Amino acid sequence: MDITIGQKATRSITLTADHVKTFAELTGDYNPLHFDKEFTEKTRFKELVVQGGLTSGLLNALVAMDMPGPGTVFMSQNYKYPAPVFIGDTITAEA
């Protein structure tokens, strides 16, 4: 797929407890920050936090399916998570 100047792509998702559970089942990330409300209430987050890998996965989908699209392979990635994502939040990936 050719990319043109000014071309854009976006993907959004509202993250649910089911998404967090499925991601944990696939990866083994059962950190109590994602599942234990009593635990999170004692942290700076105060609410259940979505796994970082789940949020960054939306960017993977955007690149692999939308821009540039099928056949794309990541050779390197770096992520910074400036704020937590909570269950019920809607996130958007843009390229």
Task: Describe each region flagged by the PLM.
Residues M1-V73:
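Hot-dog-fold acyl-thioester-processing enzymes
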Residues M75-A95:
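Hydrophobic beta-sheet segments that form the core/acyl-binding groove
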